[in-house]
Amino acid sequence: PKGNMEDYDVAMSRAVEHFKTQGVTRFIFGDIFLHDVRKYREQQLSPHGIEIVEPLWGKSSEEVMNDFLVSGFRTVVVTTMADGLGADAIGREIDRGFIASLPAGVDPNGENGEYHTFCYDGPIFRQPVPFRLGRSFSQSYDIRLDDGTVKTYSYWFADLQALNTNSDAGTGPASE
């Protein structure tokens, strides 16, 4: 979680060029309704000849979450906005109980950046991804807005650690 938007842009450009050499012409994103995010992605990727595909675009947040909850995928919260869900949500499994616990005004999918997840199991996985949640930590970022002002955003992160399946036991959101 180090760096800034310029670092992100450079990393994304490198990744795009890597995938283009493998014949990739489209990137698929799970955005639902944030026009500024979609515009950013299009501006970032169209110069590289990459088409943006948004299969969830325009669906209701409730429909998307209900589809997810019955899909068989398993995810865990790994990032939250510090002034929103905070550290307490780190490590929580996305399930009906989690969704019911969200404060009023929080998008059930975290579409406004309230939270981000790591998907570790589901119907397309041969086996669950073995991992452990290490200690949570906080990080702040200064982001330059379109009007030139700088705003500080603070987040909580899980220290997500891969487990060696040959020597480490467990799969899923085990915590230290």
PLM regions with names:
Residues 1-176:
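Nucleotide-activated chemistry modules centered on ATP-dependent adenylation/adenylyltransferase
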